């Protein structure tokens, strides 16, 4: 089978390419340039070239910087401007890795696209990985349903520690087993505010309000805060911890309250992405990557919006984040929180 492998220069994509080549497939590597960091790309391309030469496979360098800027980077900036919390990895998977890269794979005549994600596929549905601590099914839930039939996740049945051990047994790949893992958001080196600083003044002080609308303190600029944050702002006369409940970007205000006020029992979604045919769901939902799943009921409307009613309340629901719905270990839907 002819397979394009997304190669980043990391241990996961390296072992992915190795495994598929060893199974006798015709493997082609591809490194994606997503943002303008020449030194970063130069270092990673050297690693990809080293692996490609060792495996005796061809590889391509695909410049997707413009697509990445339009579909991922600027929406990241704009979402924070709106006082919401973006999910750039979900957008990148949908439009870039499982979008533009898949188009490129097809243009080469490849039957499949393989990535080093920790996830599995079964009956055209994404499943959680064997290694729960590294499971990436949440971020892959933004994928177009039609893309799934072309995907392979060779590491889905492996533990991360075993992937590293495997690489360490092969002389040429030993260095990949010990290298530092990439950061969660590839274009954020330290904090997301440093990215926003390139486009706007993030340090404009504003008012802190309580849930009744009373001014109770000051903050250092609304973009420094996300829903649920409890530090970095002043609340005069507070006798218990206060958390960000809401952000009002137009007035440069943040609304704060107690943990009890942060509690949510239902919420709305826009643009629900369904992997099964259904008008309502009885399932579990994750409201962010590292959160535990919560039982819920989902009512789906004609305009692809949805209402989610939770069995147990959750804390810190952030507009702009992705909610992912599971039937046991299978992803059945996703959507962005309004």
Swiss-Prot record:
Species: Campylobacter jejuni subsp. jejuni serotype O:2 (strain ATCC 700819 / NCTC 11168)
PANTHER family, sorted: MITOCHONDRIAL TRNA-SPECIFIC 2-THIOURIDYLASE 1, TRNA 5-METHYLAMINOMETHYL-2-THIOURIDYLATE -METHYLTRANSFERASE
Keywords recorded for this protein, A-Z: ATP-binding, Cytoplasm, Disulfide bond, Nucleotide-binding, RNA-binding, Transferase, tRNA processing, tRNA-binding
Pfam families (alphabetical): tRNA_Me_trans, tRNA_Me_trans_C, tRNA_Me_trans_M
Disulfide pattern: 92-186
GO biological process terms held by the UniProt record: tRNA wobble position uridine thiolation
Family in the record: Belongs to the MnmA/TRMU family.
Cellular component GO terms held in the UniProt record: cytoplasm
Entry EC number(s): 2.8.1.13
Catalytic activity: S-sulfanyl-L-cysteinyl-[protein] + uridine(34) in tRNA + AH2 + ATP = 2-thiouridine(34) in tRNA + L-cysteinyl-[protein] + A + AMP + diphosphate + H(+)
Name of the gene: mnmA
Upper classification of the organism: Bacteria, Pseudomonadati, Campylobacterota, Epsilonproteobacteria, Campylobacterales
Protein name: tRNA-specific 2-thiouridylase MnmA
Residues noted as binding ATP in the record, renumbered to the chain: 6-13, 32, 116
């Amino acid at each position: 089978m002819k397979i394009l492998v997304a190669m980043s220069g990391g241990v996961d994509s390296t072992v992915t390419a190795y495994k598929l080549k060893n199974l006798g497939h015709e493997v082609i590597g591809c490194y994606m340039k997503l943002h303008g960091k020449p030194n970063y790309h130069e270092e990673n391309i050297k690693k990809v070239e080293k692996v490609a030469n060792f495996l005796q496979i061809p590889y391509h360098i695909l410049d997707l910087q413009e697509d990445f800027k339009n579909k991922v980077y600027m929406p990241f900036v704009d979402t924070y401007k709106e006082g919401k919390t973006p999910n750039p990895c979900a957008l990148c998977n949908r439009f870039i890795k499982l979008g533009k890269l898949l188009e490129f794979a097809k243009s080469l005549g490849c039957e499949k696209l393989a990535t080093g994600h920790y996830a599995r596929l079964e009956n055209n549905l994404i499943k959680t990985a064997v290694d729960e601590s590294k499971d990436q099914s949440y971020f892959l839930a933004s994928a177009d349903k039609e893309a799934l039939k072309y995907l392979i996740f060779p590491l889905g049945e492996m533990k991360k520690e075993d992937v590293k051990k495997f690489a360490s047994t092969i002389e040429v790949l030993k260095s990949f087993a010990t290298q530092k893992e990439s950061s969660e958001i590839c274009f954020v080196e330290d904090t997301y505010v440093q990215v926003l600083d390139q486009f706007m003044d993030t340090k404009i002080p504003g008012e802190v309000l309580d849930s009744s609308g009373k001014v109770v303190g000051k903050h250092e600029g609304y973009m420094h805060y996300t829903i649920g944050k409890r530090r970095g702002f002043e609340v005069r006369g507070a006798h218990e911890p206060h958390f960000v409940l809401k952000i009002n970007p137009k007035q440069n205000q943040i609304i704060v309250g107690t943990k009890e006020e942060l509690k949510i029992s239902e919420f709305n979604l826009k643009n629900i992405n369904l992997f099964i045919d259904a008008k309502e769901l009885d399932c579990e939902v994750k409201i962010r990557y590292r959160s535990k799943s919560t039982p819920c009921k989902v009512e789906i409307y004609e305009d692809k919006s949805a209402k989610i009613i939770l069995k147990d309340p959750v804390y810190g629901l952030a507009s702009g984040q992705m909610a992912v719905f599971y039937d046991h270990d299978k992803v059945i839907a996703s959507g962005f929180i309004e």
